[in-house]
Amino acid sequence: MNPQLLRVTNRIIERSRETRSAYLARIEQAKTSTVHRSQLACGNLAHGFAACQPEDKASLKSMLRNNIAIITSYNDMLSAHQPYEHYPEIIRKALHEANAVGQVAGGVPAMCDGVTQGQDGMELSLLSREVIAMSAAVGLSHNMFDGALFLGVCDKIVPGLTMAALSFGHLPAVFVPSGPMASGLPNKEKVRIRQLYAEGKVDRMALLESEAASYHAPGTCTFYGTANTNQMVVEFMGMQLPGSSFVHPDSPLRDALTAAATRQVTRMTGNGNEWMPIGKMIDEKVVVNGIVALLATGGSTNHTMHLVAMARAAGIQINWDDFSDLSDVVPLMARLYPNGPADINHFQAAGGVPVLVRELLKAGLLHEDVNTVAGFGLSRYTLEPWLNNGELDWREGAEKSLDSNVIASFEQPFSHHGGTKVLSGNLGRAVMKTSAVPVENQVIEAPAVVFESQHDVMPAFEAGLLDRDCVVVVRHQGPKANGMPELHKLMPPLGVLLDRCFKIALVTDGRLSGASGKVPSAIHVTPEAYDGGLLAKVRDGDIIRVNGQTGELTLLVDEAELAAREPHIPDLSASRVGTGRELFSALREKLSGAEQGATCITF
């Protein structure tokens, strides 16, 4: 094993000793020796199966057969979640064949960040993770269930569902993906059209046609953003079946994998032969494997918050130092858009998860001795699923990458440093997705141009006010200020400035997700401006140094001068009402800092 990996793992274990012990005691107390519904009074139970078919009622009355909860995030708004419409039918059929019963225990909201990007609704995006966790918990709280299947793919949905699953950590749980849409317009062409539109060289209809050719069918968007990073990370964590993340929707193999996940969760219950509750399965080693997956693939920066919150739900304490120290030894081994031109379908064709797991296990950069939904040992995830005469089977995946432009070997990685860098200095701590930023653009020292809203940046760009070397500061975008929206609308104009050979960087307490692109961006700055961060004292013209190689984020202003300045606190009332934002005020005020997971839930 890599010594650094062991050091980080051991310090997480030590740091989490008390909280993890308390968590395990809690789930042990919740465990029962029989099916969970046996604890209900007759009236409770009758309500619970009132709408079931007669055969299912008989099974539930018997107290012998498993009842599996289905927590679904189906809606028609998310292309990745639309396929879930028919999953309950597939699941119930597979459960009946396994002498078990399934009920849709609840649905959770699922927001498409692609739809809300740059809109008021984006200010609910991060908060929706907490609502998803609580909504799933409401469904499971009926206490009718012996295991659960979680149907979710996209940005906040998988982290929220994981937090809920771990709150019911005494139950086994399997996550069931839907898979990516087929590849559409090449990513390089999509970016070209966006930048032309930002420069006023193509009209809105040309932009719309380009976007519609990129996002065109049911399934996950194919770029390597938060949704596909979710799938990568949870497969490395053993939370869904080997090789199941990136199989297309509406294919015989996808349906076979859904049925197999269903059968597997019945084996993992107290009535089965492989009892493995999710709260015991997800331990410190599993969390480290998830971080390694993120770093090795240059995944979404959102996971520097999501993984923290997910781990806390299991009583495990991680921080950005853990990400940083692992990033020093985990190489970047995948090049997917925005880190390169390839999409997630190219990744799958190049060998996918099995190749990466095999390479990282050989390098001693993953813990093999972990429990997964497929059984003990992460080496199971070097297998790939296939249909053998119409029946699902697993075989060894590719021994090495089938396309070295998409998946590199450990010996010849795209970079010897993981795709995420933690920055620190007097401005606080921040995260930079270095995997998408050319080395020559990772270091900048330039005057600040300060904005209080992302919507003010485009007019400044159009007026030529940014045609110079500068550090664009967009502040009061943190969790407590306005819910920490993603700021993707900034990328096309800032990308144009880079192409004009200006030295440009972005510094913000907001988010950018996995599609942060080529602009060097110090994001998730914590403490945020609204909550006492020095970012609130930055003025136009102040020199800021951003160094993605050494991990520096420094405001080069004399300490005495900074002490004399008053923080600038703008009127944020416009972010408090409209589009339902007033309903989230209590949650927003309780959100922790980005490094603490940006969560309002106390675990």
Role assignments for model-derived ranges:
Residues M1-N66, T72-D76, A80, E89-V108, ...:
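Catalytic or ion-coupling anion/metal-binding cores of large enzyme and transporter domains
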Residues H86:
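Acidic/charged coordination and interface sites in well-structured regions
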Residues A105-N143:
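N-terminal small/polar loop signature for handling phosphorylated ligands or for N-terminal nucleophile
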Residues R129-A136, N143-A148, M458-L466, V473:
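Contiguous domain-boundary segments centered on the initiation and propagation of an alpha-helix
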